[in-house]
């Protein structure tokens, strides 16, 4: 399950990934971001995926990158801090970080929420 809420004071979109996460879940999550007209054009995302179990293959991340590329047209820039703490989640996240190198999309992997928030607040 993926849930989200935006903190308008900090401009950070807080996202929680919990339980089983599939490719379909990720694509739907990215598509929803495109439809949110009230989000800032400089979007900062903090995703807590520490309790998620990803049912993905590395090749699935190409589809996520393609959907994100389409969504990015709506935003000036997106900063995406992704918090993980399991081996498979970390491996998939680092692979995606290398794959998703786009001019206006910055994705970083963190092991703590505090480090992720510090990065987003420093931008």
Q: What are these model-predicted stretches?
A:
Residues 1-123:
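Amphipathic, Lys/Arg-enriched alpha-helical "gate/interface" segment within cytosolic domains
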């Amino acid at each position: 399950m993926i849930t989200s809420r935006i903190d308008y004071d900090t401009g950070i979109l807080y996202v929680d990934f919990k339980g089983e996460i599939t490719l379909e879940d990720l694509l739907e999550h990215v598509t929803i971001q495109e439809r949110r007209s009230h989000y800032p054009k400089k979007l900062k995302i903090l995703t807590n995926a520490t309790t998620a179990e990803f049912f993905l293959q590395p090749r699935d991340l190409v589809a996520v990158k393609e959907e994100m590329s389409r969504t990015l047209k709506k935003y000036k820039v997106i900063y995406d801090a992704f918090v993980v703490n399991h081996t498979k989640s970390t491996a998939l996240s680092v692979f995606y970080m290398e794959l998703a190198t786009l001019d206006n999309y910055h994705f970083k992997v963190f092991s703590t929420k505090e480090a992720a928030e510090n990065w987003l607040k420093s931008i």
